[in-house]
């Protein structure tokens, strides 16, 4: 029987295992020197001024919004075509998520939709760099500066992505994810980067109980042993066990993303004869990280629904993903915003399918997926 091919699998080697073993033997397994090394290495990688390691991108989004003072009575603009955690964090802070539509072909937010949604209550704009490609930062930064509204880039999909000639995260504020399916992973984790030192200081405090320093700073760096709480905070710090894995993965990032690009190019070539619609790449200069390889399944063109095709691929031993069901179509938000209609988002939400893509895949795995797709689509047309 052919082995099951998942849509994603973390790429781990002996280097990651050795890094974890080193931390376990060190006697310091929670937030400590490895986290500091990871933050420094990430700054060097993307060219940012400040990097704050966190236990998840969701936690990073939470404390970033809090650090900006966002709360009841405020509005935050973001696409509905995103993972629900961003909208959850806005909602849990008592602010109002203002969900906007996206480009039908790239899934990127459109600057004109964001500008139309701006009101005197707007306190932040959160674009998403989708599937490994960047949003149009020039236009978004222009809006941010014109209206004096902070821009928070959701860069969960964009480790190793470039916009024009700069790495995502090099300017402004961005939040990355190191979740298990991301381009680099430490099982769970994330990184907030910013060039605003005052904002970074608030985020560092909020992510660790509202203290000015963490335990490693107090015990090993000669800081005051009794740190004071300067504001109520949370516990979103990253452990050194996780940071050690992320450091190894960060070193491997160029090779990881190069392999993803090769696999994506193979998909694009072989899918040309099928009625599936891959996401379009933006037409401005960029370096794609190929976090996800996504196609749209139009039932009229394909003769089968997206869900039907996913089920059929499962019978061939091939896993798929759905990234994502639009937030405003989820039960809680559907009931809260019953009149919200975002046509491009809704069409994509109903037709998106993620195909297997991870760096340990073989070329033959791509071929296997395409052969299965061809067989299924031909059978429903007969």
Swiss-Prot record:
* GO molecular function ontology, one term from the record: UDP-4-amino-4-deoxy-L-arabinose aminotransferase
Q: Which InterPro entries match?
A: ArnB_NH2Trfase (IPR022850), DegT/StrS_aminotransferase (IPR000653), PyrdxlP-dep_Trfase (IPR015424), PyrdxlP-dep_Trfase_major (IPR015421), PyrdxlP-dep_Trfase_small (IPR015422)
Write the Enzyme Commission number(s) for this entry.
2.6.1.87
What's one GO-annotated cellular component? membrane
Q: Catalysed reaction per UniProt?
A: UDP-4-amino-4-deoxy-beta-L-arabinose + 2-oxoglutarate = UDP-beta-L-threo-pentopyranos-4-ulose + L-glutamate
As cofactor, the record names: pyridoxal 5'-phosphate
| Keywords noted in UniProt | Aminotransferase, Antibiotic resistance, Lipid A biosynthesis, Lipid biosynthesis, Lipid metabolism, Lipopolysaccharide biosynthesis, Pyridoxal phosphate, Transferase
Question: Any one Gene Ontology biological process term?
Answer: lipid A biosynthetic process
Return any one Pfam family short name: DegT_DnrJ_EryC1
Which pathway, metabolic or otherwise, does it act in?
A: Nucleotide-sugar biosynthesis; UDP-4-deoxy-4-formamido-beta-L-arabinose biosynthesis; UDP-4-deoxy-4-formamido-beta-L-arabinose from UDP-alpha-D-glucuronate: step 2/3; Bacterial outer membrane biogenesis; lipopolysaccharide biosynthesis
N6-(pyridoxal phosphate)lysine sites (modified residues): 182
| Family that this chain belongs to | Belongs to the DegT/DnrJ/EryC1 family. ArnB subfamily.
The UniProt subunit note reads as follows:
Homodimer.
Task: Identify the NCBIfam families for this entry.
Answer: PRK11658.1 (NF008658)
Protein task = Catalyzes the conversion of UDP-4-keto-arabinose (UDP-Ara4O) to UDP-4-amino-4-deoxy-L-arabinose (UDP-L-Ara4N). The modified arabinose is attached to lipid A and is required for resistance to polymyxin and cationic antimicrobial peptides.
| Entry protein name | UDP-4-amino-4-deoxy-L-arabinose--oxoglutarate aminotransferase
The organism encoding this protein is: Pectobacterium carotovorum subsp. carotovorum (strain PC1)
């Amino acid at each position: 029987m052919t082995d099951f091919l998942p849509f994603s699998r973390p790429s781990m080697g002996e280097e990651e295992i050795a890094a974890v073993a080193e931390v376990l033997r060190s006697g310091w397994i929670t937030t400590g020197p490895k986290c500091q090394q990871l933050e420094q290495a990430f700054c060097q990688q993307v060219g940012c001024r400040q990097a704050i390691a966190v236990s998840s991108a969701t936690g990073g989004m939470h404390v970033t919004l809090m650090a900006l003072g966002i709360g009841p009575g405020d509005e935050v603009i973001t696409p509905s075509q995103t993972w629900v955690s961003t909208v959850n964090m806005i909602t849990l802070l008592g602010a109002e998520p203002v969900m906007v539509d996206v480009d039908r072909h790239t899934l990127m937010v459109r600057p004109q939709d964001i500008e139309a949604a701006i009101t005197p209550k707007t306190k932040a704009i959160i674009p998403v760099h989708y599937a490994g490609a960047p949003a149009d930062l020039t236009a978004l930064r222009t809006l941010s500066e014109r209206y004096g509204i902070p821009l928070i880039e959701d860069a969960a999909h964009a480790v190793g992505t470039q916009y024009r000639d700069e790495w995502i995260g090099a300017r402004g504020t961005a939040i990355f994810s190191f979740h298990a399916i991301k381009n680099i992973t430490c099982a769970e984790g994330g990184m907030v980067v910013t060039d605003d030192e005052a904002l970074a200081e608030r985020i560092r405090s909020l992510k660790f109980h509202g203290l000015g320093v963490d335990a490693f700073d107090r015990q090993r760096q000669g800081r005051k042993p009794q740190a004071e709480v300067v504001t109520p905070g949370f516990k979103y710090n990253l452990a050194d066990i996780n940071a050690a894995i992320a450091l190894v993965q960060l070193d491997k990032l160029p090779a990881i993303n190069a392999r993803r690009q090769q696999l994506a190019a193979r998909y694009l070539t072989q899918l040309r004869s099928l009625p599936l619609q891959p996401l379009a790449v933006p037409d401005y200069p960029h370096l794609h990280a190929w976090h996800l390889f996504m196609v749209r399944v139009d039932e009229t063109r394909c003769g089968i629904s997206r869900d039907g095709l996913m089920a059929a691929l499962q019978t061939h031993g091939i896993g798929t993903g759905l990234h994502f069901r639009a937030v405003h179509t989820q039960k809680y938000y559907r009931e809260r915003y019953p009149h919200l209609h975002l046509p491009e988002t809704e069409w994509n939400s109903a037709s998106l399918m993620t195909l297997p893509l991870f760096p340990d895949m073989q070329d033959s795995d791509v071929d296997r997926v395409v052969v299965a797709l061809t067989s299924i689509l031909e059978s429903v047309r007969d």
